């Protein structure tokens, strides 16, 4: 069976205020063409169909067009919801469109109920595991703890239990939206850390022939049976070096490692990150290759130059972002806020702030637990808003935990201290 594995379309997303709708439409054209020309037997879409819980109308229309075109080809498609999607909204009408061969799996209760397809080699069971927010699905799945590993492990227990009832030789594909240990992250993925842990071990997927993963935006191989397709388009400058693609997965007999081929996606415009003093950037002949790219420019001048964006735009007409990061020693007290926070998690930021306001005395174990609980509470509240559609304004995204989580966590510790 030939399976086309894709994910993280993020329909409706813009790139630094530049609409990507035309590029996303071009990707859908490419997807449909690939399905037709490469004799694809099934399409697997591993979550984050939309970028927001309440997507713009144009994104919904594009998704509708994609579904109609895939259905017209008569190729079964299995999709799951991701952490950016509203599972309930995406799943509306799922039972009806099942009849057209489009199988939307957004309910955690259905983790152990596969979509069963067949080819000359027999049956293939596709298990759709939508994004599982630990605080919301732990009880439903009977997980022993509220972490990602526990809830995904409980879902996979259901998969393996069902698979054990299938005829010998049944092959299996799991679609999941998660951060698996060993995967490379980028700036455009929403943090899903719970209890200080964001990732799950690859071993959680033991026992299946192929795990089609979504969430991470780089196309990558965790093991020969566990892969991320990545997003079809770049959604942050941290993805400038990515080769955007899909996986064409060919399943052989049960137990055999699948054969996987990368299928490149169209690139609407390359990305470039340039860094240096403004006069160097304007004069360097080596940067000529970036003059038609979307550009992120980081200026290292000791003093902020006059009208830097206008000057850069004369050479790089598609420059989108400007970062001012003067070169100073890391220990310099004037080092930029961005420099000091670079690479630090919400939890680390909150713990450092507690130490700062208490004259160097950081949080103890009990306070660290409070910080973790507060961060998880903010994440659960945000995700509940996505699931239920409450508190979400059309055209706006739910704030990542990083935008308010550290502050909420510090507030929890402060409140406990007052008691």
Roles of regions detected by a PLM:
Residues 41-47, 79-81, 171-175:
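Short beta-strand segments at enzyme active-site cores
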Residues 55, 72, 84-221:
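His/Asp/Glu-rich metal-coordinating catalytic cores
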Residues 8, 48, 63, 82, ...:
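Divalent metal-coordination and catalytic microenvironments
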Residues 37, 42, 251-419:
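Accessory, non-catalytic peripheral segments of nucleic-acid enzymes
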Residues 41, 76, 103:
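Residue-level detector of anion-binding/catalytic polar loops
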Residues 1-68, 72, 373, 377:
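N-terminal active-site segment of His-dependent metallophosphoesterases
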Residues 71-79, 291-293:
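Short, surface-exposed connector motifs at secondary-structure boundaries
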Residues 80-125, 209-213, 218-281:
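Active-site-adjacent helix-turn-beta-strand microarchitecture at beta-sheet edges
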